[in-house]
Curated annotation (Swiss-Prot):
This is Large ribosomal subunit protein uL24. It comes from the Bacteria. Disulfide bonds: none annotated. The keyword Manganese does not apply. The gene is rplX. Belongs to the universal ribosomal protein uL24 family. Keywords: Ribonucleoprotein, Ribosomal protein, RNA-binding, rRNA-binding.
């Protein structure tokens, strides 16, 4: 089970954007990749079509889940998340640094 979900704040651990923070837009659990806002931006050269003009367009490329770390909303630092079970059987994510529940 992945500990990264859509709309989580994450810290980039390696690569050209190391140290930057962003929000997760898309998670692909089968490929082990995520897309983060304004991180790993690449240029795509497109030909003109009937619908849109050609040119150079910038877009976010996927980044491996192993290269990012979840940011705890309480302590505002990069931390790993662990899963705890509640008495009713639901799984929740908990920050390993401060013990706060991550929604």
């Amino acid at each position: 089970m992945l500990n990264i979900k859509k709309k989580d704040k994450v810290l980039i651990l390696s690569g050209k954007d190391r140290g930057k923070k962003g929000e997760v837009i898309y998670v692909s659990p089968d490929k082990g990749k995520v897309i983060v806002t304004k991180i790993n931006v690449v240029k795509r050269h497109t030909n003109p079509t009937r619908k849109d003009l050609g040119g150079i367009h910038k877009k976010e490329a996927p980044i491996a889940i192993s290269k990012i770390m979840l940011i705890c909303p309480k302590c505002s630092r990069g931390s790993r998340a662990k899963f705890d079970k509640l008495s009713d059987g639901k799984k929740i994510r908990v920050c390993r640094r401060c013990g706060e529940v991550i929604v």
